């Protein structure tokens, strides 16, 4: 198991970050963190439940109840943004110096809060380390799982167990700006994980900025049917659309080679987007495309799902997007396309299924929005 996890850490090089100015500083990233493939552990959350209910104004149940055997999966979870403020206020000056940044902090790549990678840690301190207190760890866990729909919590834990040895074993956090103001962002990074929340500080962006998710379930090189991969169902939905396309439509949708998976910046012109335009589909095909979109946003909390749909509407709806399927990387040569992409003027959802699942997401209501992906 350890060998598998270490091998998976080779997905991409780690990002090196330089120090920033006073009063907030960040040291360069440490070497690869060691994995501890312990069995799934769930910590106490009484503190988080109490704090969250007080600051959010309404009671909620902790994530431990979401994972208790026999409990329904529709139990609501914590709202992340109020807890981010409480977490930030709990930090000592020394802690802030390692995990907090000015809102517009830039590194050698550019604006750090708009950076995205497949395998990285913005900061050194690992969540399940002694760097954070027990109460802070519980808040971080509630914040993280608050990004996702409760029905997906068990699947996300499985992904983290397979990819990182469990929740918090190779994840780190960063906070930009000052939570509680109109400029802040919480980011959690790790292998196959970049999620954000910002209370709409970045008003044009869904998810608060670009996000990344992925999974290598059984092995780095997955089989054609991707057994155990929690995100493979999304590709199945997309391939169902391909199956009902006619010959001319398939010719437009099927592209020989996929672009580099990091190429998720918006195109300068909509004419540069490849693939089959959704507006050229039949009514039944468009309905299937709506199912694909619903499948893509299903793992995430309701407010983020709403924001995605709002951004799509602002750019003319799903009709203005195109879907591409890539012949390259067809595991098993079965014409179930592992690599595919849904793209519009200010919308990119790039799904790379070979050798295992990597998904890059960049969505805005403004096609001029700039991000950094590497």
Region spans (language model):
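Short, polar/charged, Gly/Pro-enriched helix-capping and turn/loop motifs at alpha-helix termini
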Residues: 54, 61-62, 154, 303
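Intrinsically disordered, low-complexity, compositionally biased regions/tails
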Residues: 13-15, 25, 56, 61, ...
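N-terminal twin-arginine translocation
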Residues: 40-46, 57-73
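Catalytic cores of secreted/periplasmic lytic hydrolases that degrade extracellular macromolecules
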Residues: 51
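Intrinsic disorder/low-complexity segments
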Residues: 8, 23, 54-57, 70, ...
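A cross-kingdom marker for long, charged
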Residues: 72-93, 97-374
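N-terminal secretory signal peptides
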Residues: 1-46, 55-56
